[in-house]
């Protein structure tokens, strides 16, 4: 192996170490919370079956009658979302704000019985989703997750380079050498697991980044475009549909997040863009009319209805379907019942379709239990890689030292590294900025602070 190859190997190893040091805790958290959310379809019926299922009957109450039953039980509650029964044995769900709390009220759609409530933000799935998306600390958490995902991409790329056989036998490359012990065994386990999971992990990282607040938003603004003519005849506000999505609840599909929210009725003519009236709306059409409209438009069951909260607001019917080809987002005038926008899969451009498909694969929903098992396997491989990586580091680190891989003095002016850093900075600006910071710390501080021999 030439001096330059040896030098770049050490450089890749050093950056792989730094990436792993930062990424590993986040990857463990993302894998664990991802597993919880992955099995939501199985866990929810087991944990909340008494709230979610009802005996089927011949006649159901209207959506407005169901809402009245929910309000009678919780008169201070203000409706923020309605989820009609997805099938004949499902309860109706009303997400309501009550005294500062956001809770879901479950109603038997046939008998009008209030089955119970659930804190909409303080249940297993909501907590797992909030941790997975923003660590439950808002924007700062979102940026940290984005950084971790970006560094994860670098971790995978550098890991594949370090794994590359370079004339070695398949043993320890394509499968671990189970006859070995100690650090060599853990290194084999780490390298082989990382190799087999590399491509799938990249798909998971990149599809997940589509939801991040900084990179994901810029990505959507750049690539996710609808024909301007779709909105030319519709009065719109300065708000985008992304306001309907929260850390704990998904309402509209990713493809709709950067689309404008239409406004209702005569208020559209007098609206001051960017300033929405604070007073709640008093819609003239009934909730059942919106349900009937969704049925007539063949919206797939499992959709939600978000009512207007202002005099200019609209009803939004949205389904974030397991198969994105069944996605639908409808905005309905609260006064006339006119459909102001009806956006489906066929309206998405190629990038939006690819991203929506990636998101559904990411969440394990696209191909049923097969998709779930594949994502579960990826999560388990992430956990195994993280644990084995920590064990390798622990076994090779010198006493009292950090164990940073040695930096050779014959590196060729960091040219290759600078090209990689520049590429990552362009694709992932936050990652690029953090790379510069870590590079400076490594050159000016860490390389001197921990300058001691290290076993390869």
What is each stretch, according to the model?
Residues 1-456:
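Conserved histidines in hydrophobic membrane contexts and catalytic metal-binding motifs
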């Amino acid at each position: 192996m030439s001096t330059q190859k040896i030098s770049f190997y050490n450089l890749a190893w050093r950056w792989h170490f730094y990436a792993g040091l930062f990424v590993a805790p986040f990857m463990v958290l993302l894998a664990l919370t991802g597993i919880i959310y992955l099995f939501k379809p199985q866990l929810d019926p087991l944990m909340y079956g008494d709230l979610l299922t009802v005996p089927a009957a011949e006649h159901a109450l209207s959506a407005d009658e169901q809402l009245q039953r929910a309000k009678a039980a919780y008169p201070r509650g203000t409706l923020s979302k309605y989820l009609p029964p997805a099938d004949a044995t499902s309860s109706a769900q009303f997400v309501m704000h009550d005294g500062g709390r956001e809770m879901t009220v479950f109603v038997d759609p046939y008998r009008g019985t209030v089955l119970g409530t659930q804190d909409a933000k303080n249940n297993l799935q909501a907590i797992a989703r909030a941790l997975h998306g923003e660590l439950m600390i808002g924007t700062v958490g979102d940026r940290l997750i984005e950084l971790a995902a970006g560094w994860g991409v670098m971790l995978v790329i550098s890991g594949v380079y370090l794994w590359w056989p370079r004339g070695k036998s398949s043993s320890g490359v394509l499968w671990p050498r189970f006859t070995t012990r100690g650090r060599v065994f853990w290194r084999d386990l780490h390298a082989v697991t990382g190799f087999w999971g590399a491509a799938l992990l990249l798909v998971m990282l990149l599809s997940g980044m589509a939801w991040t607040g900084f990179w994901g938003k810029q990505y959507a603004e750049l690539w996710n475009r609808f024909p301007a003519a779709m909105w030319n005849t519709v009065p719109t506000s300065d708000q985008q549909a992304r306001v309907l999505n929260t850390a704990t609840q998904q309402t509209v599909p990713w493809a709709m997040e950067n689309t404008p929210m239409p406004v209702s009725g005569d208020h559209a003519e007098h609206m001051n863009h960017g300033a929405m009236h604070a007073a709640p709306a008093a819609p003239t059409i009934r909730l059942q009319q919106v349900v009937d409209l969704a049925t007539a438009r063949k919206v797939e069951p499992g959709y939600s209805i978000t009512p207007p909260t202002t005099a200019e607001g609209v009803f939004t019917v949205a389904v974030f379907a397991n198969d994105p080809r069944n996605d639908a987002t409808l905005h309905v005038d609260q006064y006339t019942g006119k459909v102001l926008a009806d956006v489906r899969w066929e309206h998405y451009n190629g990038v939006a379709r690819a991203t929506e498909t990636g998101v559904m694969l990411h969440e394990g929903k696209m191909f049923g239990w097969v998709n779930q098992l594949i994502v579960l396997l990826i999560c388990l491989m992430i956990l195994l890689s993280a644990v084995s990586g920590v064990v390798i580091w622990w076994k090779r680190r010198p006493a009292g030292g950090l164990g940073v891989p040695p930096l050779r003095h014959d590196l060729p002016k960091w040219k290759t590294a600078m090209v990689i850093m520049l590429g990552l900075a362009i694709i992932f600006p936050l990652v690029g900025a953090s790379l510069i910071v870590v590079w400076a710390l490594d050159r000016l501080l860490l390389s001197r602070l921990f300058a001691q021999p290290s076993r390869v």
